Design a protein with these regions (language model features):
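Flexible beta-alpha connector loops of hexameric P-loop NTPases
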Residues: 83-84, 111, 159-167, 195-209
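Conserved P-loop NTPase
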Residues: 27-31, 35, 41-76, 80, ...
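Substrate-engagement module of ASCE P-loop NTPases
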Residues: 206-227, 231, 247-258
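Loop/turn-to-beta-strand initiation segments
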Residues: 135, 161, 181-184, 222-227
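Short metal-coordination and nucleic-acid-contact micro-motifs, chiefly zinc-binding Cys/His arrays
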Residues: 6-8, 22
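Short glycine-rich substrate-engagement loop in P-loop NTPases that contacts/grips substrate
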Residues: 91, 152-179
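The Walker A/P-loop phosphate-binding site
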Residues: 56-155, 174
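Short cysteine-rich clusters marking metal-coordination/redox-active sites
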Residues: 12-15, 26-29
């Protein structure tokens, strides 16, 4: 393509640091063997001006501030006061972790091990919100519509206000979102999305960073709430550059043994609430079910009157929880 030059650069998989040459240790986060080479594209001024007109090809600038020529710094006293708009997700446990419900225009990242139930909880949440009259668009890059329908039939029916789309192209997804204007968008998953402007494979550092940046601009400009699924690495962190967690508003981790029935939803970052709250769910055949009394789960199977066992109370956010503490004490020959 005329006016476009291609070259490669090295990116840190942990923090997203960019370097012109390879280094064994990232100069930013000090991680070893985290630099990977990826092609990047440098556009000419003409093509850059065309890109500034928006993802959909319109002449309306697509940026957080609109046309840069009309931007002016203003004091906070001239900014209109708007009440924080929250709405329920249909799960009281999820609302608790989010700080009282989802915030309009926020970007929420769901992380967790494969098979832990990330897609299931978001599909159930989408059904609950759609049943409450909220328009929801569920975008999947990992499953076909037939597979999603089979899973939806297992957990219950999906209302007609819940729309589904199987697509991974960021440009197409952005156009559909701007045309349909849903209130909530679910992306499953961010590692499958790609932008044509980045000449690298989906899931790479450049692709994850660019697609998340575009979704963030969409959320802030339109007021649409985004829930995006992120895969985790063997260390238990979200795959991709660490900058991904810094860009989003909320980071939630779905924890638990995939072979056990209980799951714990924990918030590690929340710009609109506390990160001390947790939500407890139980995985059943019909999907995830909330556990309103986690103490019962913590003490399940504890024999009454057993030695070496004590019950203590701890606070997880605003919720007191009873947990069992065990100690093994045996007689020794030292008196």
């Amino acid at each position: 393509m005329a006016g476009i030059r291609k070259k490669t650069a090295f990116f840190c998989q942990e923090c997203g640091y960019e370097s012109a040459k390879w280094t064994g240790q990232c100069p930013s986060c000090k991680a070893w063997n985290s630099m990977v080479e990826e092609p990047i594209r440098i556009s000419s001024s003409k093509s850059s001006a065309a890109a500034a007109r928006g993802l959909s090809g319109s002449r309306t600038p697509f940026s957080l501030g609109g046309d840069n020529r009309s931007l002016q710094p203003v004091p906070l006293s001239q900014v209109k006061d708007l009440a924080e708009t929250r709405f329920s997700t249909g799960f009281s446990e999820l609302d608790r972790v989010l700080g009282g419900g989802a915030v309009a225009g926020s970007l929420v990242l769901f992380g967790g091990d494969p098979g832990i139930g990330k897609s299931t909880i978001l599909l159930q949440t989408s059904c609950h919100m759609a049943a409450a009259g909220i328009s929801v668009l569920y975008i999947s890059g990992e499953e076909s519509l037939r597979q999603i329908k089979l899973r939806a039939m297992r957990i219950g029916s999906a209302p007609d206000t819940l729309k589904f789309l199987c697509e991974t192209g960021l440009g197409t997804i952005s156009d559909i979102i701007l045309r349909s204007k849903p209130q909530v968008v679910v992306i499953d998953s961010i590692q499958t999305m790609y932008s044509d402007d980045i000449q690298s494979a989906p899931g790479s550092v450049s692709q994850v960073r660019e697609t998340t940046a575009v979704l963030l601009r969409l959320a802030k400009e339109t007021g649409i709430t985004f829930f995006i699924v992120g895969h985790v690495t063997k260390e238990g962190t979200v795959a991709g550059p660490r900058v991904l967690e810094h860009m989003v508003d909320t980071v939630l981790y779905f924890e638990g043994d995939r072979y056990a029935s209980y799951r714990i939803l924990r918030g590690v970052k929340n710009r609109f609430g506390s990160t001390n709250e947790i939500g407890v769910f139980e995985m059943r055949r019909e999907g995830l079910v909330e556990v309103p009394n986690p103490s019962e789960y913590m003490l399940s199977g504890r024999p009454l009157g057993s030695s070496g066992s004590a019950v203590t109370c701890s606070m997880e956010g605003t919720r007191p929880m009873l947990t069992e503490v065990q100690a093994l004490v045996v007689r020794t020959n030292f008196g």
